[in-house]
């Protein structure tokens, strides 16, 4: 199979009407988010393919998002956009995920998916997020600390990964 450059498009690219690539694909969940008339018109005149993401890739994305700590920041649509990018990579295509969403970019980086921002600078480092107790500072999994009963907050774990090649 011939390697093709494919741009997987997040809804932000459609809302900004900045998706101007030759080979564009998105998922049905993104199409469902298009509510304004200008974006709907833009979407209808561009040559988008709309395809489902595979359940296997959805699970891979969820696992990666759990590892980075972004799982609670991603919508089902975000997860499926990332999964579609993985599907295209598995087909042997050269993939660029087009999004301004930093959580999507972070998970994409952890999965080795190239990405481009639309209006905002893209991330250059991968971040890991963890829940910690607001009261005692312990790392926890739940929303309430089982030790002291305080609420969880999300904190970034510092690291120096700089792996985006896009």
Curated annotation (Swiss-Prot):
GO CC terms of this entry: preribosome, small subunit precursor
Residues that coordinate or bind Mn(2+): 10, 101
Mind listing the GO molecular function terms for this protein?
magnesium ion binding; RNA endonuclease activity; rRNA binding
Task: Using the UniProt record, name the top-level EC class of this enzyme in a single word.
Answer: hydrolase
Q: Where is the PINc domain?
A: 5-106
Keywords (alphabetical) are:
Endonuclease, Hydrolase, Manganese, Metal-binding, Nuclease, Ribosome biogenesis, RNA-binding, rRNA-binding, Toxin-antitoxin system, Zinc
Annotated region described as Zinc ribbon, given as residue ranges = 128-159
In Swiss-Prot or TrEMBL terms, this protein is called Endoribonuclease Nob1
Q: Which organism is this protein's natural source? A: Archaeoglobus fulgidus (strain ATCC 49558 / DSM 4304 / JCM 9628 / NBRC 100126 / VC-16)
């Amino acid at each position: 199979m011939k390697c093709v450059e494919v741009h997987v498009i997040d809804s932000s690219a459609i809302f900004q009407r900045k998706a101007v690539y030759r080979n564009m694909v998105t998922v049905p969940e993104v199409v469902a988010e298009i509510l304004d008339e200008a974006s709907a018109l833009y979407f209808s005149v561009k040559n988008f393919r709309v395809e489902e993401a595979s359940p296997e890739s959805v699970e891979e994305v969820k696992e990666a998002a759990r590892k980075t700590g972004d799982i609670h920041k991603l919508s089902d649509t975000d997860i499926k956009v990332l999964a579609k990018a993985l599907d295209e990579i598995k087909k042997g295509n050269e993939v660029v995920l087009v999004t301004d969403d930093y959580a999507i970019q972070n998970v994409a980086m952890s999965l080795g998916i190239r990405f481009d921002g639309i209006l905002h600078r893209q991330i250059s480092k991968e971040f890991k997020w963890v829940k910690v107790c607001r009261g005692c500072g312990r790392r926890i999994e739940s929303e309430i600390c089982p030790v002291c009963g305080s609420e969880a907050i999300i904190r970034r774990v510092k690291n120096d990964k700089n792996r985006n090649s896009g």
